[in-house]
Design a protein with these regions (language model features):
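Catalytic cores of the polymerase beta-like nucleotidyltransferase superfamily
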Residues: 1-453
Length: 453
């Protein structure tokens, strides 16, 4: 049963079918605010339906994210109807966001649209009253289903339910037109190919043909939007399989024009269980591991990633080119410098050695050498030494006799490295180490630093 009684809204111009049990269970958990929105629209004589991704995810029994509503109510009337709770987020496209209970719900007026001249947005939008027509302009059959909550009816004019049962991604109607209308649908098709199992769905041949024919239209889509879709693909369980398919279909070059060929071995590596916990920067570093650091930087710049993603990707990619020695002190410095990247770094180096992939410009490491390092790493105890240096500049000057300046700073860094290497957590022990250092002689530029590599 619904959380509260709901009056029936205007009927759809479609024949519906009773919602299956999995959808009915979801409807019974709908937020009260959603019911209130539907009820108010029905009170004014409008039709209102839950639509798109929320219906798809609920059918699978997945956690439902955004709940989207479509309605015959024009946006201007919606703004008046919901007053201060209404936000005109996309009125020109019929979308109004309704606030309530700390959440936001998008309500979009049914639309009829003309040509998409820029490959992304319709040239002209007119409000409609036909749910059939509205669903017919959506991207894929699995996203073109709607639910009448009050009547408990599912509207599925393009057989999205059958395609979900058969694990097929199919365009609504003419696949060529769908790709021409909105070129971002090309990337969305690949994103929907996998649903957490690691196995890919089949792409309908007509959709695949349309994507291959129109992939060049991706250049019409803002790179930020392309990157947003690819970022989601990168984090999927079957990311390697999806990206490999994109490369074979001639699509990946519109995402990574600087890195148009990637070894199939790397795609296979991306789908290993050990790799599935990696972050986006770590996955990007693996994907582009055969390219030089400068090329990776240009790739991140082209994608207009966030500064953090660019910095983390370039840093991890560069660090992957190096390995610590299989000695406790070296590994402690490695752990200190890389932090949470340390364990993924060693894991990836072992994976790359196992599959025979060479990092650009670096000699091939055999698995046995990596095993020596990982064996020592596995026996490494948690650090006792604090991450910050135990002593400050005043302490250094009083113990060493070295005055303020670059030489003192370099000496402190050298001592800090020793603190980490030897896992020292006591100032007296550190003072003993200082007394053994030949800091009164030699060029300070050659003193060890606390860094990796």
């Amino acid at each position: 049963e619904l959380p509260k009684p709901l009056r029936s809204a205007k009927e759809a111009d479609l024949v519906g079918e009773p919602c299956p049990p999995n959808l009915l269970r979801w409807l019974a958990t709908l937020p009260a605010r959603v019911i209130e929105i539907l009820d108010r629209l029905a009170e004014q004589g409008h039709g209102a339906w839950l639509v798109g991704g929320c219906v798809r995810d609920a059918w699978f029994g997945d956690e439902v994210g955004d709940i989207d509503i479509c309605s015959t109510c024009p946006p201007e009337e919606m703004l008046n109807l919901f007053g201060n709770d209404a936000i005109p987020t996309g009125v020109e496209f019929g979308t109004v966001t309704i606030k309530g209970d700390g959440e936001h719900f998008e309500v979009t007026t049914l639309r009829t649209e003309s040509q998409y001249r820029d490959g992304r947005h319709p040239e002209q939008v007119e409000w409609g009253t036909s749910l059939q027509e509205d669903l017919s302009r959506r991207d894929f059959t699995i996203n073109s289903m709607a639910v009448d909550v009050a009547r408990g009816l599912l509207y599925d004019p393009f057989e999205g339910k059958a395609d979900m049962e058969a694990n097929i991604i199919r365009a609504v109607g003419n696949a060529q037109l769908r790709c021409e209308e909105d070129s971002l649908r090309i990337l969305r098709a690949y994103r929907f190919l996998e649903r957490g199992t690691g196995q890919l769905w089949r792409m309908d041949p007509a959709l695949k043909e349309a994507i291959q024919l129109h992939s060049k239209r991706l250049d019409m889509v803002a790179i930020e939007r392309r990157w947003n879709e690819v970022k989601k693909i990168l984090m999927k369980s079957g990311a390697g399989k999806i990206l490999h398919t994109m490369m074979e279909d001639g699509v990946l070059k519109y995402i990574f024009p600087h890195c148009q060929f990637i070894s199939p071995k790397i795609f296979d590596a991306m789908d290993r269980d050990a790799v599935k916990e990696l972050t986006v920067p770590q996955r990007l570093s693996l994907l582009l591991v055969e390219y030089k650091p400068k090329v990776v930087f240009e790739a991140m710049k082209f994608l207009k990633t966030s500064k953090t993603t660019m910095k983390d990707t370039c840093r991890f990619h560069e660090q992957l080119r190096h390995l610590p020695q299989p000695m406790a002190g070296e590994l402690r410095v490695f752990r200190h410098c890389l932090g949470q990247d340390a364990a993924p770094h060693l894991m990836l180096r072992k994976v790359l050695s196992t599959i025979g992939v060479t990092i650009h410009g670096m000699p091939q490491m055999n698995v046995e050498d990596i095993d020596k390092i990982t064996a020592m790493w596995d026996t490494l105890q948690p650090s006792r030494a604090p991450s910050q240096c135990l002593v400050d500049g005043h302490w250094m000057m009083s113990r060493s006799g070295v005055g303020q300046g670059i030489r003192l700073g370099r000496l402190k860094e050298w001592l800090h490295r020793i603190q980490i290497e030897k896992d020292i957590d006591d100032r007296l022990m550190l003072e003993r180490e200082l007394s053994l250092l030949p800091f009164n002689h030699g060029d300070h530029e050659h003193w060890p630093k606390l860094q990796f590599p």
